Amino acid sequence: MKGTKKKTPCNKKLGGYLKEQKGRLYIIRRCVVMLICWHD
């Protein structure tokens, strides 16, 4: 299983996708926090 990491060129694509998802999650979380604070 160790050798499969080197062979996959889609690893970079996956990393970028994960980064994008992380950023989106962060934005959504901030919006939720702002909404909760705003309700109080």
UniProtKB/Swiss-Prot annotation:
Listed Pfam families: DVL (PF08137)
Localization of this protein: Cell membrane
Main localization, broad class: membrane
GO BP: negative regulation of cell population proliferation; shoot system development
Keyword set includes Metal-binding: no
UniProt keyword Transmembrane helix present: yes
InterPro entries: DVL (IPR012552), DVL/RTFL_small_peptides (IPR052153)
Tissues of expression: Mostly expressed in flowers and stems, and, to a lower extent, in roots and leaves.
Membrane topology, as annotated: Single-pass membrane protein
Transmembrane parts of this sequence: 12-28
GO cellular component: plasma membrane
Keywords: Cell membrane, Developmental protein, Membrane, Transmembrane, Transmembrane helix
Annotated stretches, region: Required for DVL/RTFL small polypeptide activity: 9-40
Biological role stated in the UniProt entry: Small polypeptide acting as a regulatory molecule which coordinates cellular responses required for differentiation, growth and development, including leaves shape, pedicule elongation, inflorescence organization and fruit maturation, probably by restricting polar cell proliferation in lateral organs and coordinating socket cell recruitment and differentiation at trichome sites.
Family: Belongs to the DVL/RTFL small polypeptides family.
PANTHER family: OS01G0525701 PROTEIN, SMALL POLYPEPTIDE DEVIL 1-RELATED
Protein name: Small polypeptide DEVIL 3
Species this protein is from: Arabidopsis thaliana (Mouse-ear cress)
